[in-house]
Amino acid sequence: NLYYAPDPSSQIACSIGGNVAENAGGVHCLKYGLTVHNLLKIEVQTLDGEALTLGSDALDSPGFDLLALFTGSEGMLGVTTEVTVKLLPKQPVARVLLASFDSVEKAGLAVGNIIANGIIPGGLEMMDNLSIRAAEDFIHAGYPVDAEAILLCELDGVESDVQEDCERVN
C-alpha cells in the first residue's frame, strides 16, 4: 500500500497542479514534508511558451533545484502540466491521541515538548476553542467543547514504536 503524503485541508476539491503551485502541506507535513518534498519531476509550460522538465525520476539530481524554485511560485513562473510524485509505504499502525488544555499557550508548549523529546508525529493539529466548537457543531466528533485548546497527535509506524511514543506523549 502506497500513498501520497501531502494532505492539504482542501484535498476534497484541490488538484495536484494547485498543490504544486501553492506548495501545499497539511497536518502530516511535519513528518512527511510539503509538496516540494514529495515531488520527483514536473513538466511545466513557462510564460513564454517553453516546455521544461524539472527534477528527475531519481530522488536526487545534480545542479540547481529548479523544481523547488517552481514549486510554490503560485503560477508566476508558468503552469504545471505533468507531475511525478514520490509515493510512500503506508505505515502499519497509526493512533491519534487527543489532549485538551485550558489555554492555547499550554497547547503550544506541548507541541514544542513533543518535538523536543524526539517524537515526530505523523500528524499534529492544534485547535482553539472557536475551532473546536465549529468542528463539533459540524461533525460531532466528541471534542471537548469546554477546552480552550486541543491537540490531535497522530503517531504512526510499527506497533512497538507507536506504543512507546504514545506512552512518552502521555
Where do the protein language model's features map onto the residues?
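Noncatalytic alpha-helical scaffold of FAD-dependent oxidoreductases
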Residues: 1-170
